[in-house]
Design a protein with these regions (language model features):
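Acidic, glycine-rich loop-and-strand cores that form catalytic or ligand-binding grooves
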Residues: 80, 84-88, 94
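Alpha-helix C-terminal capping segments
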Residues: 21-24, 87-91
Length: 161
């Protein structure tokens, strides 16, 4: 699942994606990947996301919700280090500072490479089984239909196996 904290559509799907990920069939999982394009804001956002993922993965969903709130509702920017320190505090993430320093450039580059590999050109985008890329644009922004499409694509892949 490719997302950007600067994307209002991603913010609107935040809780939906979190709930949906818990309903996936056995053997399936949702991987959230920040859009790690080489600009300062996205670079910092991706680094913060990976730091939380490493430091305190059980707090990742809370961190994402806090980041969306700060950026989408409170007008903070992805370039501002204060955005991430506040999101970490709001989500009660432990071990963030050490993890921040351990996020490598290679990890950010791998996330960017995946973005290019799958041809992701909009957020949010779901890549299903490495074969299908779907966005809310595919269903004219209908969130219920988008989630049904995602479930249908997973069923299709399961039948093909």
């Amino acid at each position: 699942m490719f997302f950007s904290f600067a994307c209002p559509v991603c913010a609107s799907y935040d809780q939906t994606f979190s709930r949906w990920a818990k309903t996936l069939p056995p053997g399936w999982s949702a991987e959230f990947l920040p859009v790690a394009v080489p600009d300062k804001g996205n670079y910092i956002a991706a680094r913060a996301f990976f730091a939380v993922q490493d430091a305190d993965p059980s707090r990742l969903a809370a961190f994402m919700s806090a980041a969306y709130t700060l950026i989408q509702q409170n007008g903070m920017t992805m370039e501002d280090p204060g955005t991430w320190s506040r999101a970490v505090a709001m989500a009660d993430v432990q071990g963030f500072n050490e993890a921040w320093h351990n996020v490598t450039q290679q990890r950010l580059e791998r996330a960017f490479a995946k973005l290019l590999t799958y041809g992701v050109d909009a957020t949010p985008s779901m890549v299903i089984s490495g074969k299908y890329v779907i966005t809310p644009d595919d269903v004219s922004g209908d969130s219920a239909l988008y989630m049904n499409l995602a479930n249908g694509m997973i069923s299709k892949v399961m039948q093909e196996r």
